[in-house]
């Protein structure tokens, strides 16, 4: 467990997990659902393969309607448009079978004009089967009617080359199978879909949730309408209009041009030649309703003044300010705890990928004792199922994943370390 705690951060860093985490959390805040994908990418590290963690576009993911847990869906489909040239280079059997995509995928509105004429829809189909009392996850990748890869058709037995000593004491290289073929074991040994959902505001009977845009767009639309009305009324009052008699003697062009100090008139200037059109100002209750709507939006989305560090003028006690901040951060704490739970599931899935695929020793640079760099070698030998005695019972190591937060800013680190340093100093003085 200690070794895993040291090498898993290396794996996350190789996947730029900070950016992946940020992108997924932005997706969660805006749309209500963030999805991570934990895969085994055989093309990584020059064909050796390694774990790949990527954000997943929830618009391209399809599951069984009515389920609240992705793992309970019988089938899961992930659709993606890929370039025809890339597909032909990887799968020559697709020659003459590719064309413009006829399927309509939900896409985000962008300023760029996206050309889909040279792209083809590729479907990744994940499905589960019960075999021998256990759940097996199978995978099929296809384009149109052509199957590109299917685990049920994969009979290849993975093996590694190891050096052994025979009966005569000579060293020989032998091929040792490390696991069964994919047609028997499936895609991943844990039997779970490689997708992790993180919801902001859960919806009953759905895997997805509401985002801040969903819960705040109603009040925001009303605020925008009232704000437009107030601005329009202000502009109308600032730029008055005039009624002019058809036989009026005032030069309109000169009267409308404020840069000209003189306005020419013909004959006597009567009071009824020009008359200003009166604009009724909006009553004060309109501004009050607008402010109330703004406060409603703040409380609905949890973006209150207390959350941003501002308190009412009458609140001065530190305990009262702390109580207000504690009460105002309930929604953010719930969202953070949800992200922690999703992150724990992601780490457990990473451990399962290590257990299944790290057959050969790999070198990692970790932080050793005293903060010094240390290079260690690790493989999955101690993670696999092990015999427990003559009864031929097998046990698989299981790990507890605990997520703890760390303050990122230097100021908070200094503020929290100051009491510790002071206590340490006082202990030496006494």
Would you name each region that the model predicts?
Residues 1-429:
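Extended alpha-helical, oligomerization-prone segments that build pores/tubes and scaffolds
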